[in-house]
């Protein structure tokens, strides 16, 4: 037996024991920064969903921002208890119960891997029924020098905010599965098989952005939207679970490599009791093929 020695990542924690950064050997900056998996709800005081569209479309920038500030309110989840840390042979799992007036039984968890620069995030909550307009977000902050995110839509990569059709939407983006940030020390990749809609620098409601926001390094995944009238139910209560992966890569990575990596992280392992007969080619073909959520948007 050979005793394998590895360079463990440097971790930091807040006063409640939640992890605020993780940096592996060879990285100048951490994989993520303080605020990982913070949960936020945008509330709307105006129950008329259609009025939001009128404000967005027909007011000038100053009027629009003033009006949205008047009718909206942001509310962040708070720690319900100290975070708990459990060590496995290959990782640390940090788990913390959270509380927010709009959900019950909320928990966030991150698994920090020892040998590879990777963090697996899980957010769980039980949404309380309500028809009031509201939007749920999860925050993923990266180092400040992480700029110019790249993503794919329909398998086609492009630089967000730059390589877009003029006057197309820059408030939020529908992605296939991953977002890549380039930095001086390497790339950081955010991926999810559950959340295909993201924004940057904050929530996207009423923004009408023309350029990239100041805090482009802060990614927000939209978990639930009770405001939109298209493709979202007006009220979907009950338990919801979302998974994300944050990884670091040195050197250039092709779109195919990033997609394969992201797909491999959120495909559950399938165990098949193989009979004596040959495997079915159709079953084998689709067994490990992720079904992308973006097809419904």
Regions found by a protein language model. Give the residues of each.
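C-terminal (or distal) subdomains of carbohydrate-active enzymes
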Residues: 1-297
